[in-house]
Amino acid sequence: MADALRFVAWSCCLQLLFLLLGVQGYEVPKAKIDVFYPKGFEVSIPDEEGITLFAFHGKLNEEMEGLEAGTWARDIVKAKNGRWTFRDRITALKPGDTLYYWTYVIYNGLGYREDDGSFVVNGYSGNNASPHPPVVPVSTTPWTPPADPDIDIRLGCTTPKTEVNGAPTRCAGQLVFVDEFNAAKLDPNKWKAERRFSGQPDYEFNVYVDDAPETLCLANGHVVLSTNTMKKQFKKGSGESLDLGEKCTGQANTHDCVRNGRTLNDGLPPMVTAQFSSKDFSFKYGRVEVRAKMPRAQWVTPQIWLQPRRPIYGVDDYRSGQLRIAYTRPNGGNLDLYGAAVLFADEPLRSVKNCLKPGTGNNSEDWSDSFHNYTLEWTPRELRWLVDGKEWCVQGSAKGSFSETTAAGKSLPQAQKLEEGTGLAPFDQEFYLTFGLSVGGFNEYQHEIKPWNERAPQAQKAFWKEVKKIRDHWLDEGHMKIDYVKVYSL
């Protein structure tokens, strides 16, 4: 039995290794090192499309211990003259000296390393080369960086808490994922768009599609997510059938991909929207920043989520958690801002870890008229929500584990499973990014006045009957724009 368990564990480790290797499809270019006389050296790689950061970490005549920061620890955030270049103008190197180093590149929003680098000084480069230079002792003067606004300096690197794709990050405070959406379409190396009907646990009144510019497009450096009607998008009424085809991202030959409105009490969903998620990027602990402009339409939920990579604590009903960085709801003439650590799908447990920032009507807090920065700081002990740099919500395990959460006398059905994790479980596993729009549904609006009843067999039709009266105005207010997303290690 023990041998069998060891074999299973070994097989799982091997599969994980293959998965990680499959993700690392990009190889960091070999660093070019030039040493100058009487002092200074450069480390560089060639520029290429997709690189947004190059980092160098090194020590002189002393091997690096793993991914330590080293004597030199610098991020270069802009290429010059076709190369990403780290420059030291102070240190004097002599023949026989050895530079030990590792480099790091963010390519297409993902981080890659070249580890265990070493370089032995055999001579000098450039016009200052000298065949017989005098022996110059290594400077012990602390290194002082040049005043270069294009260089982001991080000396005294601290051990990070963040993990990315199952591996520890190199240093706290580093940019590990970024997309500023400046291309003509979503980067397929970073994102995967959904194409499926909605389902449990919220059964939204929409289908997600991946090929409709009316619901998802990139323009002026923004992702624009919009709502559309089934009638406009597919020229189909409620009582007709719709097959999303081989590109469906749900389970084939199920209600994820095919529905016949004639056989359903509620017919086809009346709305079409979009949703996309990070393809090969997931992380545990970090700082997520999203600059976005929210929709104002009633019963449209903007999705700026973190979703679990693996259902460690349960598959259904958000038992493995969902982190909502930000979403909004109309409230009279104002727009309320919410954040949430969702532990279960049904009330009263669903909203027990919600945070609310009531709308004030002030221009500075009109979440739909202008862009705002929505931030989540996720550490092993707490979750902090910020908007425009100001903290407005904290949820943590200092006063008790999340597994102990109760509401109206009810406990979490997965509480015993959560006790196997940390106090912050289920938020002690890797999560991935999700952006999108959903419309209506069950659970999402349980406490709000709405034209449909929870679990009613014809809830979608009741929703559409109400919205149809104000369709054009409602659609005009059903947009969300995202300027950028950035993830930093902590």
Curated annotation (Swiss-Prot):
<dbReference type="GO" id="GO:0061760">
    <property type="term" value="P:antifungal innate immune response"/>
</dbReference>
<dbReference type="GO" id="GO:0001530">
    <property type="term" value="F:lipopolysaccharide binding"/>
</dbReference>
<feature type="signal peptide">
    <location>
        <begin position="1"/>
        <end position="25"/>
    </location>
</feature>
<dbReference type="Pfam" id="PF00722">
    <property type="entry name" value="Glyco_hydro_16"/>
</dbReference>
<dbReference type="Pfam" id="PF15886">
    <property type="entry name" value="CBM39"/>
</dbReference>
<comment type="function">
    <text>Involved in the recognition of invading microorganisms. Binds specifically to beta-1,3-glucan and activates the phenoloxidase cascade.</text>
</comment>
<dbReference type="GO" id="GO:0045088">
    <property type="term" value="P:regulation of innate immune response"/>
</dbReference>
<dbReference type="InterPro" id="IPR031756">
    <property type="entry name" value="BGBP_N"/>
</dbReference>
<dbReference type="InterPro" id="IPR013320">
    <property type="entry name" value="ConA-like_dom_sf"/>
</dbReference>
<feature type="domain" description="GH16">
    <location>
        <begin position="162"/>
        <end position="490"/>
    </location>
</feature>
<dbReference type="GO" id="GO:0032491">
    <property type="term" value="P:detection of molecule of fungal origin"/>
</dbReference>
<keyword id="KW-0964">Secreted</keyword>
<feature type="glycosylation site" description="N-linked (GlcNAc...) asparagine">
    <location>
        <position position="373"/>
    </location>
</feature>
<dbReference type="GO" id="GO:0002221">
    <property type="term" value="P:pattern recognition receptor signaling pathway"/>
</dbReference>
<dbReference type="GO" id="GO:0009986">
    <property type="term" value="C:cell surface"/>
</dbReference>
<keyword id="KW-0399">Innate immunity</keyword>
<dbReference type="GO" id="GO:0038187">
    <property type="term" value="F:pattern recognition receptor activity"/>
</dbReference>
<dbReference type="GO" id="GO:0005576">
    <property type="term" value="C:extracellular region"/>
</dbReference>
<dbReference type="GO" id="GO:0001874">
    <property type="term" value="F:(1-&gt;3)-beta-D-glucan immune receptor activity"/>
</dbReference>
<dbReference type="InterPro" id="IPR035806">
    <property type="entry name" value="GH16_GRP_C"/>
</dbReference>
<keyword id="KW-0732">Signal</keyword>
<dbReference type="GO" id="GO:0035008">
    <property type="term" value="P:positive regulation of melanization defense response"/>
</dbReference>
<dbReference type="GO" id="GO:0160032">
    <property type="term" value="P:Toll receptor ligand protein activation cascade"/>
</dbReference>
<dbReference type="InterPro" id="IPR043030">
    <property type="entry name" value="BGBP_N_sf"/>
</dbReference>
<keyword id="KW-0391">Immunity</keyword>
<comment type="similarity">
    <text>Belongs to the insect beta-1,3-glucan binding protein family.</text>
</comment>
<feature type="glycosylation site" description="N-linked (GlcNAc...) asparagine">
    <location>
        <position position="362"/>
    </location>
</feature>
<dbReference type="GO" id="GO:0005975">
    <property type="term" value="P:carbohydrate metabolic process"/>
</dbReference>
<dbReference type="InterPro" id="IPR000757">
    <property type="entry name" value="GH16"/>
</dbReference>
<dbReference type="GO" id="GO:0005615">
    <property type="term" value="C:extracellular space"/>
</dbReference>
<keyword id="KW-0325">Glycoprotein</keyword>
<dbReference type="GO" id="GO:0001872">
    <property type="term" value="F:(1-&gt;3)-beta-D-glucan binding"/>
</dbReference>
<protein>
    <recommendedName>
        <fullName>Gram-negative bacteria-binding protein 3</fullName>
    </recommendedName>
</protein>
<dbReference type="GO" id="GO:0019732">
    <property type="term" value="P:antifungal humoral response"/>
</dbReference>
<dbReference type="GO" id="GO:0002758">
    <property type="term" value="P:innate immune response-activating signaling pathway"/>
</dbReference>
<feature type="domain" description="CBM39">
    <location>
        <begin position="26"/>
        <end position="126"/>
    </location>
</feature>
<dbReference type="InterPro" id="IPR050546">
    <property type="entry name" value="Glycosyl_Hydrlase_16"/>
</dbReference>
